[in-house]
Amino acid sequence: KTKAALENLKNKDFVFLHVEASDEAGHDGDVDLKVKTIENLDARMIGPIYKEVKTWSEPVCIAILPDHFTPVELRIHVGEPVPFIIWYPGIVPDEVERYDEISCVTGGYGLLRLRQFMEVLMQY
């Protein structure tokens, strides 16, 4: 998936990469597995994609977020806003150092619903 995403980014304006692992861990109610799957995604997909696109002359925007909120306590999908990260050359980072539902709310964008998130994303 990582290789395919990078190849498509070379000639497409938008690439959507969907990974199910952390959602399944939420359904299982396994917080340790959910953390491990997110760390694995960072090491095997997000990190390599970020490292590669930083070297490109054409800027690329990266957004990282789940497709829905699946709290391990509830083990079901809920309609709450999800934590997200947006990276683009020139965006000044905020003070958030952890990727989780509580920390991301304190970030520069706060809590956004889908329409608001897409409006922000399309600025880049």
Residue ranges and their predicted role:
Residues 1-124:
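Feature captures the catalytic ectodomains and active-site-proximal regions of enzymes
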